[in-house]
Amino acid sequence: MIKINLLNHQSHSFPSKTTPLEIWKNWLKKTLKKPVAALFNQKFIELDYPLTQDGDLEILAESNPKSLFVLNHSTAHLMAQAIQRLYPNALFTIGPAIKEGFYYDIDFQNHSISEKDLPTIEKKMHEVALENHSMIMKKVTHDEAKRLFSYNPYKLILLEKHKEEDITVCHQGEFIDLCRGGHIPKLSLIKHFKLLKISGSYFQGDAKNKSLTRIYGTSFFKKEDLGNYLKLLEERKERDHKRLNKKLDLFMFSQEVGLGLPFWLPKGATLRRIVERYIVDKELSHQYHHVYTPIMANVELYRTSGHLEHYSQNMFPVMQLENKEKIVLRPMNCPHHMMIYKKSPRSYKELPLRIAELGMMHRFEKSGAVSGLQRVREMNLNDAHNFVRPDQIEEEIKKIINLILEVYRDFKITKYEFRLSYRDPQDKEKYFPDDNMWQHAENILKKTIQELNLPFREAIGDAAFYGPKLDVQVLTALGNEETLSTIQLDFLLPQKFDLTFIDANNKHCRPVVIHRAIVSTLERFLSHLIEENKGVFPLWLAPVQILLIPVSSSVNLKYTQEIKELLLSQGLRAEINSKEATLGYKIREAQELKIPYQIVVGDNEIAKNLITFRKYGQKNQTTTNIETFISSLNQEIMEKR
């Protein structure tokens, strides 16, 4: 007999090899409708999977959001079967379910596939689904699997990589795929799906391997849900910072200069400068010391820090100089800040010592990963390293968290969660091998966030190589999860750089370093602001706050220029649209540029020494004197509305 804990916390004993479907029929049929799969000990399984051990079981109905993962995984199999019929020579690699759908990486060999082919593949998928094949899992030996996939070199490589594991395959009609499982019972349940796009990829993410075709799709149980999701995708497209930038003209890239190297154009540079000043002023008010350090360093500095050993794949090649010195562009600011700390003997009275920098860094991102401002090769990180005594760790982390929340309030960031990232103890290559250090550091971070009563989730394998970290994961307007803020606890670098402070007993002691970034890189943060605000920035952030529009450039321009000079003298950012165009055209253009305020200047305003303004997104106009207008704007800026 096996003991199964159902989701309602009831425990029951069943004969070994009882299936989830049998349990549903006998115990849950009246309360749970339309089961499609199950979750056993946090692993997705089929309804006919024979249970042979104790564990936690959740039967998944169509209405359960978790079922979408199983549906999308099954739809990836359906797509592969349809493609095999259309392109018999296609070789399949991997086809997982992902957050909002699925993809499959395919080697089409001699065929070239484009998005024009997706409707044909979709049509074939519907045909195959109507055949209503069962999705049958079968355990096979390693040798049997090699015979089944002897024609596919990609599957053979995967089999060799997992030769110590149990091998299972999924049958659906004539199609067989290597798979761990988690499928719906029959293909006829797959009705409402859409193939979304095609991109390039490499087998196992290695650019040295052959280029593959990746087809993305999504699948839902209800037609209405698919329609709503496709509408959401259109909304996200409208918010994409790359698309919005075509009108806003904030930044650019140049193929002649290089991939992932952004240019900040005048309006974008203004926006960046506002954020930079805000961050620096905020950190200075929290007793940080801002510095500037070199963007490159002797390679030995990174050998000492451990970056050369653990992070070299993300670094640009070393430059050999004429005096045999080896220089590298820095991927991190940490070693430079260690040097500043080490410059002078430090007393325990000086700690915490908070060294901050808007530091330029260079990291080698693969060409396929570079994307707009979110993934670039040159970036500017809002970075700081807080050097503390061991007894100050918890209090300092709390202060950093409060600073993060303060900044989030000002930028109206509300969709986020804390993620506590640990090392994977089995990964001896990625992480520094000191079990006691890791256990101690992880316990401190967990204890601190628990004391603040902040909800968090845990993630194994996402720590930095030198220590655990507390990340703030922000949900973007495009539905992605991005790390915006991070707090990393480090006992290792002080040891590697032999950092010390003199305690009250005149003894040398080792400080602890807390790495922290409040708004990530400026590039990523600004892309987030563009998308979150859909290009409509609050007044305090807007690169151009007021656009002055003379009714007649020849008659009204002089008074318009006087107003502009007055606005500029008050610290406001104003421009004039003096184009020879109709008033309606100028107003529409101001709306497209998403400028917060437009002031129309005509004969009536000049005669009465007034202005007429309209706020972005509003139809009504207001006429007032310039002093009242400036006062209301200053109030709006002060309140960061």
UniProtKB/Swiss-Prot annotation:
Catalytic activity: tRNA(Thr) + L-threonine + ATP = L-threonyl-tRNA(Thr) + AMP + diphosphate + H(+)
Family stated for the protein in its record: Belongs to the class-II aminoacyl-tRNA synthetase family.
Enzyme Commission number(s): 6.1.1.3
Subcellular location: Cytoplasm
Domain TGS: 1-61
Xref: NCBIfam families: thrS
SS bonds (residue pairs): none
Keyword Transmembrane helix: no
Keywords of the record: Aminoacyl-tRNA synthetase, ATP-binding, Cytoplasm, Ligase, Metal-binding, Nucleotide-binding, Protein biosynthesis, RNA-binding, tRNA-binding, Zinc
One GO CC term on file: cytoplasm
Stored Pfam families: HGTP_anticodon, tRNA-synt_2b, tRNA_SAD
Region (Catalytic): 240-538
Protein name per its UniProtKB record: Threonine--tRNA ligase
Species of the source: Phytoplasma australiense
Main location: cytoplasm
Cofactor: Zn(2+)
Cofactor note: Binds 1 zinc ion per subunit.
Highest rank taxon of the organism: Bacteria
SUPFAM superfamilies: Class II aaRS ABD-related (SSF52954), Class II aaRS and biotin synthetases (SSF55681), ThrRS/AlaRS common domain (SSF55186)
Single GO molecular function: tRNA binding
Reported function: Catalyzes the attachment of threonine to tRNA(Thr) in a two-step reaction: L-threonine is first activated by ATP to form Thr-AMP and then transferred to the acceptor end of tRNA(Thr). Also edits incorrectly charged L-seryl-tRNA(Thr).
GO terms classed as biological process: threonyl-tRNA aminoacylation
Description of how the protein assembles with itself and partners: Homodimer.
Enzyme class: ligase
